[in-house]
């Protein structure tokens, strides 16, 4: 009886040890697989991050150099979608912000700091050009001026208003016409014509929309004003 009991004990211990060994081996395999998957996922994530194209301020195509402000803007689309003006990744004017309107939309920015000074829109179809002229005259030297049309930005423009905008660096303002699409970035006190201007004429033969040309867009890097 003692021999039989001892034999049972030996068998029980052997079964326990075998079971423990098998479980430990399976657990180790699962741990190795889990760690392998973890490392594989980490490597894949690193590859995705390294191949994902970088995003620059305002969604422009390349980074701006130091002491420059990134900007991107678009004119309105027909009389349906308002213009959009972005500077340094901050949307200054848009339909979502509910601060755009028919006519010429204007954002004024401090040329040294990039801080927003004011946003306005002036109805050049059914409005009066006089408030727009007074607004243009009051712009201080060193101010960055960004403009974009929506619907019609030209009907009420007179020679004085066009001259004041030309003094900000615009070339196209002299022949901006009814329902043309136009975006412009210039500055008060600028000594040369601005390189930042796009203009599409309203032409029934080439218009993208019925009665309006396609949206005009522009992006770039504005030099920061230095003392």
UniProtKB/Swiss-Prot annotation:
MF-aspect GO terms: carbohydrate binding; cytokine activity
Domain of life: Eukaryota
Compartments, record wording: Secreted; Cytoplasmic vesicle
Signal sequence, start to end: 1-24
Domain GG-type lectin: start-end pairs: 67-225
Gene Ontology cellular-component annotations: cytoplasmic vesicle; extracellular space; Golgi apparatus
GO biological process, one term: gene expression
Cystine connections: 58-86, 64-221
A Pfam short name: ILEI
UniProt keywords, alphabetically: Cytoplasmic vesicle, Developmental protein, Disulfide bond, Lectin, Oncogene, Secreted, Signal
Protein family (similarity comment): Belongs to the FAM3 family.
Biological role stated in the UniProt entry: May be involved in retinal laminar formation. Promotes epithelial to mesenchymal transition.
Classification via PANTHER family: UNCHARACTERIZED FAM3
Protein name from the UniProt record: Protein FAM3C
Organism: Bos taurus
Gene name in the database record: FAM3C
